[in-house]
C-alpha cells in the first residue's frame, strides 16, 4: 500500500514538473497582492477592490479574494506575467467567483490581454484576447461568456451556456486545444464542448482546398488527335501497269474510309471511374490565422460593471495542462466548497432564529402596549 502511494505521489510530481504555469494567484500573502495587481486610473469613478473572504466562507484565509466594494460602478484591475504564445499548446484559464450579494445585474467574467496592454488606462475599449465567465442581468441574461478575438473582431460562442446564479463560490474553467476543440467546465464538470470553428461561426475563416488530381491519373475523356484523318491508303492495291507518271502525274492510290471516331472505338487511357479525393486543410492559411492561437498573452484582469457589489474573485490560473488545472481546482475550491455551504446554512438558521425572536418581542411588546393603553383609558373614564 505504501509503495503504491509513493508511486502515485511520484506520478503527480512528474505531472506538475511537466506542466507550464503561466499565472497563478491565490491571495495568500495579505495586502502584498497590491504589488502584483494594478488598479486602472482611466476613470476616477471606477470602483475599488478589497481583499475579503466574504460574510461566509469555507476557510477564512484560503477563500480571500478580490471583492468589489461599491454599487453601480465600473471596475478595472489587472496583473501582468511573462508573455507567452499558446501556439501548438493547450490553453487552460480557470478561476473562482462568488456572488454572495445574490447578483441581480453585473459581470463576473475575466479577460486575458496581450502583453502590451496599458494597465493604468485599462477600460472597456481595451483590446483583449479572451473574455470568459458569468454575466447576469435580470431574468433574461444568465450566461457564460466565451468571446475570442480573431482577425480584429470579437466572436462569441453561439451556444447559450448557463451560469450559476446562487450566492456560493463556483469554479469556472475554459480549455482551448490546438486541434480546435474546446471545453467549458463549471465546478469541474463539462457543461459545453465542441469545435471552435463551428461554435463561433468561424468556418468561413478556416478555408479548405481540394488538392490537384494526381498527375499519373488518366483523364476521363480523350480528345481526337489533331492529325486524325477520315481516310487511309488501301495497302492491298498497286499502281496500274499502264500508268505513265510523266503524263498522268502521281498515281492516286485508292483510299478506304475510316470508321467514325465515336463508333465504338475506345481511346487509350480512358478511366470512367470518378477520381476520389478528400478535402485537405489549407495549412498555409491556418498557420497565419489559427483560431485557437494567441501570440503575446501577458496579462489577466477584471473589467466589468456591477449594479450591486460584493463579488469575490479568487484562485486564478493560466496553464497548458488540463490535469494540473483539475488538481489545482480540487486543492482550492474543492477543499472549501463544503465548509462554505455549512457556514452559510448555520448563518441562515441563526438569522431565522433571530428574526423570530425579534418578531416575538414586537408582538409581546405590542400586547403590553395594548394592555397599558386599555388600563390608562379605564382610569381616565373613572376619573371623569
UniProtKB/Swiss-Prot annotation:
Residues 249-283 are annotated as: 3 X approximate repeats. GO terms for cellular component: endoplasmic reticulum lumen; endoplasmic reticulum membrane; nuclear envelope. Pfam families: Calreticulin. InterPro entries: Calret/calnex, Calret/calnex_CS, Calreticulin, Calreticulin/calnexin_P_dom_sf, ConA-like_dom_sf. Its main location: endoplasmic reticulum. A motif (Prevents secretion from ER) lies at residues 381-384. Keywords: Cardiomyopathy, Chaperone, Differentiation, Disulfide bond, Endoplasmic reticulum, Glycoprotein, Lectin, Metal-binding, Repeat, Signal, Spermatogenesis, Zinc. An alpha-D-glucoside binds at residues 109, 111, 128, 135, 303. The keyword Repeat applies. Belongs to the calreticulin family. GO terms for biological process: cell differentiation; ERAD pathway; protein folding; spermatogenesis. Residues 295-384 are annotated as: C-domain. GO terms for molecular function: carbohydrate binding; metal ion binding; protein folding chaperone; unfolded protein binding. Component of an EIF2 complex at least composed of CELF1/CUGBP1, CALR, CALR3, EIF2S1, EIF2S2, HSP90B1 and HSPA5. It comes from Homo sapiens (Human). During spermatogenesis, may act as a lectin-independent chaperone for specific client proteins such as ADAM3. Required for sperm fertility. CALR3 capacity for calcium-binding may be absent or much lower than that of CALR. Transmembrane segments: none annotated. It comes from the Eukaryota. Residues 1-19 form the signal peptide. This is Calreticulin-3. Glycans are attached at residues 42, 201. Residues 198-294 are annotated as: P-domain. Testis specific. The gene is CALR3.
Amino acid at each position: 500500500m505504501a509503495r503504491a502511494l509513493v508511486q502515485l505521489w511520484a506520478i503527480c510530481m512528474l505531472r506538475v514538473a511537466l506542466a507550464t504555469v503561466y499565472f497563478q494567484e491565490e491571495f495568500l500573502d495579505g495586502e502584498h497582492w497590491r504589488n502584483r495587481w494594478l488598479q486602472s486610473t482611466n476613470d476616477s469613478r471606477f470602483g475599488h477592490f478589497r481583499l475579503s473572504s466574504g460574510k461566509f466562507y469555507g476557510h477564512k484565509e484560503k477563500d480571500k479574494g478580490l471583492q468589489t466594494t461599491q454599487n453601480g460602478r465600473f471596475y478595472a484591475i489587472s496583473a501582468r506575467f511573462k508573455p507567452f504564445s499558446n501556439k501548438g499548446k493547450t490553453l487552460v484559464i480557470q478561476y473562482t467567483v462568488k456572488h454572495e450579494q445574490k447578483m441581480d445585474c453585473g459581470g463576473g467574467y475575466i479577460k486575458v490581454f496581450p502583453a502590451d496592454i496599458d494597465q493604468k488606462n485599462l477600460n472597456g475599449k481595451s483590446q483583449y484576447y479572451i473574455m470568459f465567465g458569468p454575466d447576469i442581468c435580470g431574468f433574461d441574461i444568465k450566461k457564460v461568456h466565451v468571446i475570442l478575438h480573431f482577425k480584429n473582431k470579437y466572436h462569441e460562442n453561439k451556444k447559450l451556456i448557463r451560469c450559476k446564479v446562487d450566492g456560493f463560490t463556483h469554479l469556472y474553467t475554459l480549455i482551448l486545444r490546438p486541434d480546435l476543440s474546446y471545453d467549458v467546465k463549471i465546478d469541474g464538470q463539462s457543461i459545453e464542448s465542441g469545435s471552435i470553428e463551428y461554435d463561433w461561426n468561424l468556418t468561413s475563416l478556416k478555408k479548405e482546398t481540394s488538392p490537384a488530381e494526381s498527375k499519373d491519373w488518366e483523364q476521363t475523356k480523350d480528345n481526337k488527335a489533331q492529325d486524325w484523318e477520315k481516310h487511309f491508303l488501301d495497302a492491298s492495291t498497286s499502281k496500274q501497269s499502264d500508268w505513265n507518271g510523266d503524263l498522268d502525274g502521281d498515281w492516286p492510290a485508292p483510299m478506304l474510309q475510316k470508321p467514325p471516331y465515336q463508333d465504338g472505338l475506345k481511346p487509350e487511357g480512358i478511366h470512367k471511374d470518378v477520381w476520389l479525393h478528400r478535402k485537405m486543410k489549407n495549412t498555409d492559411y491556418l498557420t497565419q490565422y489559427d483560431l485557437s492561437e494567441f501570440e503575446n498573452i501577458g496579462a489577466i484582469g477584471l473589467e466589468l460593471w456591477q449594479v450591486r457589489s460584493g463579488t469575490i474573485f479568487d484562485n486564478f490560473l493560466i496553464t497548458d495542462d488540463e490535469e494540473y488545472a483539475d488538481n489545482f481546482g480540487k486543492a482550492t475550491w474543492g477543499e472549501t466548497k463544503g465548509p462554505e455551504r455549512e457556514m452559510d446554512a448555520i448563518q441562515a438558521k441563526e438569522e431565522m432564529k433571530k428574526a423570530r425572536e425579534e418578531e416575538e418581542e414586537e408582538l409581546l411588546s405590542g400586547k403590553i402596549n395594548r394592555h397599558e393603553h386599555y388600563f390608562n383609558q379605564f382610569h381616565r373614564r373613572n376619573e371623569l
